[in-house]
Design a protein with these regions (language model features):
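Phosphate-handling DNA/RNA-contact segment within nucleic-acid enzymes
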Residues: 1-106, 110, 123-124
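Conserved protein kinase catalytic domain
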Residues: 34, 38, 128, 150-153
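Flexible glycine/proline-rich, aromatic-decorated loop/lid segments
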Residues: 100-103, 129-131, 166-172
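Conserved acidic, small-residue-rich alpha-beta core segments centered on
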Residues: 123-134
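C-terminal or mid-to-C-terminal helical accessory/interaction module adjacent to the motor/catalytic core
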Residues: 136-173
């Protein structure tokens, strides 16, 4: 049986661009099954050590000396399409020290862009502890309740998104 049948598939790359695995989102929200599905864990693919979008974002993260972290694949894609390229995703999982180590190779500044719902706030708070423990500077930018970086950005220009991120990002400490 095709593991990813009826799903949009997102290739997940290493920092060097090698395809390590896939994430997939169900197309029909009516089905009673997991919304997201990933490649099985293996020696090559370990979700907790990978950041979605890192291969495409790494140069801009280093250039701008800041990394935006979002929750999901579509958040990364939408922001990249709008021109905000220094964005990666924790792929819906809590941030890990391995993921932060990847970012630390590029910058010491992280801005968390998580959903405006309770789960997003909780994920942000958990991630902040790991980022601070790793010795990085952390800022937080929240979105209006019910919005995530993807939905917020859909009808906005690059300039509007950039202004929002600059005006609503707050140093955590």
């Amino acid at each position: 049986i095709d593991r990813f049948r009826g799903r949009v598939i997102f290739p997940i790359h290493s920092m060097s661009g090698r395809t390590l695995g896939f994430g997939a989102r169900i197309l029909n929200n009516q089905l009673k099954t997991a919304k997201y599905l990933n490649s099985p864990e293996s020696l090559i693919y370990n979700k907790s050590t990978i950041l979605y979008g890192i291969f495409y974002a790494k140069q801009e993260i280093a250039k701008l000396d800041n990394c935006f972290i979002v929750e999901g694949y579509t958040d990364v894609i939408q922001l990249h399409q709008k021109g905000v390229m220094n964005v990666v995703s924790s792929s819906g999982t809590a941030l890990t020290i391995d993921q932060i180590t990847l970012i630390r190779r590029l910058t010491s500044n992280v801005t968390m862009l998580f959903d405006g719902d309770k789960a997003g706030v909780n994920a942000t708070l958990r991630g902040i502890d790991i980022i601070l423990t790793a010795g990085l500077n952390v800022s937080v930018c929240s979105f209006p309740n019910g919005e995530d970086p993807d939905s917020y950005s859909q009808d906005k220009s690059y300039e509007e998104i950039d202004d929002y991120l600059k005006n609503n990002s707050q140093d955590f400490i």
